[in-house]
Amino acid sequence: MDNTTPFPSLNVRIMLLLYRSIWLVCLPLVIAYLFLRGWRDPIYVKYLGERFGIHKQRMKPHIWIHAVSLGELRSAAPLIEELLKSDTPIVTTHFTPAGRRESERLFTTAISDGRLTACYIPFDYGAALRRFFKAFRPKYGLLMEFEAWPGIIMNSRKKQIPLFICNGAYSNHSIQRDQKRYFSPAKTLPGLSGAMVKSEFQADQFRQLGVDKVAVTGEMRFEQRIPTPQVAAATAIRKEALNSRTVITLSSIVFGEDTDALQLIETVQTHFTQQGLAKPLFIYVPRAPERFGLISDMIAAKPFIYGMRSNLLTEDLKMICPEKIKDLDILLGNSLGEMYFYLSLCDLAIIGGGFCKKGSHNISEALCLGKPVMIGPTDYGIEFPAREAIEYGVCKKLDFEQITQFLLNNPAQFCASDQVDAFVASHSGSTDKTMAAIKLFLDP
């Protein structure tokens, strides 16, 4: 984008007019959807007023952090902890119940002390956002990862609230898609006050999109908390039930990848059996909980000895029957919020999403645990740190057939944990860099 072009351009003004009209038309459908989801999870409708920006008036201006869901909130946690050291209260906003619950879990003390409020993001239209701004009077806002909400960006600009992308990344795939569109939410990005991004490559992307102030701050996910009880539970199970057995975790496997993933497991298990070798244990963690039942049925149709986490482990991850775990071919990870446990168990992590052109899911958790990683051919969404990790030798980009051949001919752990740890250490310090960038952007 030409930075000399007045913002917003006529194109953007027309897009915003259409966007507001669509919101007015679709709002009843959105509310109906929330009530439908509320049948299973009442939290979708319990705080419906927050979706309209309805809050009691706060006495002090707040720092506003928008973390759409669980992953974004966890990556923001070290930054939030640092910001809580100031006298300014914080409001975190979320689109999903998972993000809100995680904020309430991580910052229980700050919430009870009145230093932090967790709530839903208002619907992305003017009246709801104005009510939210009036209640919290944000000093500035941070949009975690990449969020191009036209209403948020333009209403913040109108109210002169500095708004920044934080831990930002914008994939080549998304840029190519959005450049082909006459109307794209990304065209409102020049309305941001700045962006703090993961790499120099990402900095160039945001500058091309018209964002004036850009700082490279690294990957915040490398600094998120690692739940030590989950790591300790995995260590105990490896010691008591698995000994030196190779463990491979397939995590965040999405719809469209299951058939090939299960074929990989079957081929590898058959090969090791025929060779008279100890078979690896595969841990299979679907991306979406609603798929747990379907995947269980698919595994049951195969010649596997398998079990589910819900049947073999207690709530605090203690083994109910160690002998059953020793004999497993596949452990189905049918639980939420325990990814660090499943990854801590393994020697190698295979991360889904990139095997069916949907874009790979996050690899940072596995790397933080010192695990080498394999991803599918499509890496958009995690171009950083995937490209750097591949160059460093701690990540491989392969299809399922290539991974199968690799596992048949090589040790699963293709690089040492020390090498992975060194890679993560080389990209640390994101929280401090982000704090410095915020100060620079606000007080140039």
Identify the role of each PLM range.
Residues D2-P444:
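Nucleotide-activated sugar donor-binding and catalytic core shared by glycosyltransferases
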